[in-house]
Amino acid sequence: MAEHGLKIAVVGPQRTGKTLLCRALAEQPILLGEMSYQPTAAVRIQEISRVLGIDRVKVQFWDVSGSVQYQSYWPVLAKEVDGLLMVIDPNRPEQERDLETFYRNFAEPNNLYTRQCMVMAIQVQKEGGGLGGWQGLQGGLKKLSQSYVAINPANPAAGVQEAYSHLDVLFQGALQSKKEALESSYMNQEDQ
């Protein structure tokens, strides 16, 4: 089984559930109650392993702060990103403009294809909470893959399972692009 690594930047406005998602995916403890929200200072990195077909993939989630206070770090954090997961609060569709800024700062410098980018609307819900309804993106980013996931911080397993059903598509797209770039670099070396 071939082993690969992927760097996925997880970006979006503050308080959209980026850290909750990353911690739940990495099976890390999730804080509840008054301490449940702790703003990310620059970046947090979580790692997971997935098997995609015949490939074992070690995924690093770079959970990037949504605060403009850390915007000067974005070029460094965006360096050599293999994929981009943009997170939005489905109850705040005006955040789509913010996602366009993240796209320009993380996807465009890395020449990412649409298959390497995804928008995920995360509904942070309490026990018995409803899913609500998200209409999807309306602007320039509507060409990207979009998903909607509800995560209950007290019991995130169902939300994690739903998230993986979408994220595996992102991982496969990022892995395919990485393999193609590697093959292209080998071909260019042989031509010299």
Swiss-Prot record:
Gene Ontology, cellular component aspect: motile cilium
Primary location group: other
GO molecular function, one term: GTP binding
Subcellular location, record wording: Cell projection, Cilium, Flagellum
Sequence similarity: Belongs to the small GTPase superfamily. Rab family.
Assembly and oligomerization: Component of the IFT complex B, composed of IFT88, IFT70, IFT52, IFT46, IFT27, IFT25 and IFT22.
Name of the featured protein: Intraflagellar transport protein 22
Organism per entry: Chlamydomonas reinhardtii (Chlamydomonas smithii)
Gene: FAP9
